[in-house]
Regions:
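Long, ordered, helix-rich scaffold segments
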Residues: 1-250
Length: 250
């Protein structure tokens, strides 16, 4: 039971339009409140400061996504002037969802600032994977090719690949099917050395029957491609086989 014939592009279009509409209609109020919430004292992990930061971040998200270059600049400034990791990471996450020239520069600057911290690097991996901008797959593949990324490290895979396959609802469901093909490529690669690790990358594609016909067929084709590959593990074969069998019984 649930939604069927889901069109992720249509959902995203409506969501973005609503966000832009609110961001523009409430622009001046948002800007005033954003400035009012600027912290004057030292950073504290208190409930009061946490609530203020959360509201400030939500306002910044609406402003940065309303289409005004000045507000993208505000997001860049937010990251650059951050005196704590929370502000910097949230700002980077907001900017990562905007297709603009500053995005890649700030992503690289953040990496260079924090690359020596393994835990922060994991968070950066997630931001890269979840970024819903055109070319997201190329960005993930680029990180996978770098010496600082280790596919054998579960935490690396969980954050970078999990960010894309589990949380990037836009580019994973790109209407050209590239996200589904990428998933099949990665599953087949991982299956060679960690046969039990692929299932956590698959929650979106396991819901393939609920999507609109074009995406449904593209996802099914990649599931069939995996199932027909010689030498895959019994676990992956069973997982994919069950998904395909359920569709035939439905």
């Amino acid at each position: 039971v649930g939604l069927t014939d889901i069109d992720m592009s249509a959902i995203d279009k409506v969501r973005r339009k609503l966000q832009r509409t609110l961001g523009r209609a409430l622009e001046h109020r948002f800007l005033d409140r954003y400035r009012d919430l600027r912290r004057s004292g030292d950073y504290e992990p208190s409930a009061a400061q946490t609530a203020q930061r959360s509201l400030r971040h939500a306002i910044l998200d609406y402003l940065a996504n309303n289409g005004e270059p000045a507000h993208v600049d505000l997001c860049v400034q937010h990251i650059s002037m951050a005196d704590n990791l929370t502000d910097a990471l949230v700002g980077l996450g907001i900017l990562s969802r905007i297709d603009c020239d500053d995005r890649q520069a700030m992503m690289q600057a953040f990496y260079e600032r924090w690359c020596s911290d393994p835990l922060v690097l994991l968070k950066w991996f997630f931001v890269v994977g979840a970024s819903p901008v055109p070319g997201a797959i190329d960005g993930v593949r680029h990180v996978m090719s770098q010496p600082y990324f280790d596919l054998m490290n579960p935490a690396h895979g969980m954050n970078l690949l999990g960010g894309f396959f589990r949380r990037n609802y836009i580019e994973f469901h790109n209407p050209d099917g590239s996200g589904y093909e990428f998933l099949a490529d990665v599953l087949l690669e991982i299956d060679q050395f960690r046969p039990d690790a692929g299932s956590w990358l698959m929650p979106q594609i396991m819901q393939w029957r609920r999507h609109e016909p074009r995406r449904r067929e593209l996802m099914r084709a990649q599931l069939q491609r995996i199932a027909s590959t010689d030498g895959i593990s019994s676990g992956l074969y069973e997982l994919v086989g069950n998904a395909l069998a359920e569709s035939e019984a439905a």
